[in-house]
Amino acid sequence: MTTIGTPLRPNATKVMMLGSGELGKEVVIELQRLGVEVIAVDRYENAPAQQVAHRAYTISMLDGAALRALAEKEKPDFIVPEVEAIATATLVELEQEGYNVVPTAKATQLTMNREGIRRLAAEELGLKTSPYRFVDNLEDFKQAVAEIGIPCVVKPIMSSSGHGQSVIKSEDQIQQAWDYSQEGGRAGGGRVIVEGFIKFDYEITQLTVRHVNGTSFLAPIGHRQEDGDYRESWQPQAMSDLALKRAQETAERITTALGGRGIFGVELFVCGDEIIFNEVSPRPHDTGMVTMASQELSQFALHARAILGLPISEIYQISPAASKAIVVEGKSNNMTFGNLDKVLEEIGTNIRLFGKGEVNGHRRLGVILARDENTEKALAKAERAYAKLAVQL
């Protein structure tokens, strides 16, 4: 029998979130709806999830000693990583000592860098991927580009939201791509992956939730990216029965290998009926924000249930829906979001503003959500709402 205590009391069920971005914020809210006490941790103060948690701490999560000290102080029932830049060796130690790391310390360690998960997928599980090379210096990088061929994709082995990622389309871009990769890694410069460019029909996120009753699949999510970062997503993505079956099989194989309970964002390329594995995140996925409009239980609510060992009997889709990221460019720590009466005037339209305190360059500050009778109309509705938004820096 699963039980939950009372927040801020000795019997509280406690979750410590490592990373407090907009995805973590929604997980915190869902956990609190279930009576869980939440501690939010990030490298900067007043991160989105910290704003809604019971307590917040600001540390470098790459500092294993600081991470251990915090775990020993709070003694959480669950440690839930939300970002890649974490001292995963410390998480492995804590798990061995009896702490419950979600989904597992192994999953967090393997997926924190692209090398671990690519070698698991391609070399151990035999999943189809793009051709790839891992390199540590400019000389080997140039050789890898020559072997893989142009065009090719370059990514730091540890980064997110497109940071440090680029596509080499001509030889004169090789040096620039290397330099950019060294600036964009979560842990600084260093090792990168060079991948062959896949000519796919479309790409999907196959959200997969491992829970006390087994493994369940959400309807596939289509999405569009710019510079490696999500801009729009929609659910469901139309695909053939065979392609969907293969996508779910691929997702089940990789998530089973990672183990544990929780939601996984499995990124796949689709070429006709063929499925090519790209990446997996052992946590909610940015493209999955659309589920806040499309499903009875969003990816965040499903993650919370899975973490706590609560049953997930059915994943019910309310409506086709779409999301559009609110990406702002500039420099400010005092943003204003205006014209909201116009943004929300159409039925089935909603907005989430993340509460981020500043922007310096490009930053995702919110998301538009829209429902309609099909995904094309939902996306058009989201785009109309987005066009009406006035952001003042």
Swiss-Prot record:
Entry binding sites for ATP: R114, K155, S160, S161, G162, H163, G164, Q165, E195, G196, F197, I198, E203
Subunit structure as annotated in this protein's UniProt entry: Homodimer.
Keywords from the named record: ATP-binding, Ligase, Magnesium, Metal-binding, Nucleotide-binding, Purine biosynthesis
Cellular component GO terms, alphabetical: cytosol
Organism: Actinobacillus pleuropneumoniae serotype 3 (strain JL03)
Source domain of life: Bacteria
Pathway: Purine metabolism; IMP biosynthesis via de novo pathway; N(2)-formyl-N(1)-(5-phospho-D-ribosyl)glycinamide from N(1)-(5-phospho-D-ribosyl)glycinamide (formate route): step 1/1
Gene Ontology MF annotations: ATP binding; magnesium ion binding; phosphoribosylglycinamide formyltransferase 2 activity; phosphoribosylglycinamide formyltransferase activity
Pfam assignment, any one: ATP-grasp
Gene3D superfamilies membership: 3.40.50.20, ATP-grasp fold, A domain, ATP-grasp fold, B domain
Family: Belongs to the PurK/PurT family.
Identification of the protein by name: Formate-dependent phosphoribosylglycinamide formyltransferase
InterPro entries cross-referenced by the UniProt entry: ATP-grasp, ATP-grasp_carboxylate-amine, ATP_grasp_subdomain_1, PreATP-grasp_dom_sf, PurT, PurT/PurK_preATP-grasp, PurT_C
Enzyme class: ligase
Transcription in keyword set: no
Reaction(s) catalysed by this chain's protein: N(1)-(5-phospho-beta-D-ribosyl)glycinamide + formate + ATP = N(2)-formyl-N(1)-(5-phospho-beta-D-ribosyl)glycinamide + ADP + phosphate + H(+)
One GO term (biological process): 'de novo' IMP biosynthetic process
Residues that, per the record, bind Mg(2+): E267, E279
Residues of the ATP-grasp domain: 119-308
Its biological purpose: Involved in the de novo purine biosynthesis. Catalyzes the transfer of formate to 5-phospho-ribosyl-glycinamide (GAR), producing 5-phospho-ribosyl-N-formylglycinamide (FGAR). Formate is provided by PurU via hydrolysis of 10-formyl-tetrahydrofolate.
Residues the entry annotates as binding N(1)-(5-phospho-beta-D-ribosyl)glycinamide: E22, L23, E82, D286, K356, R363, R364
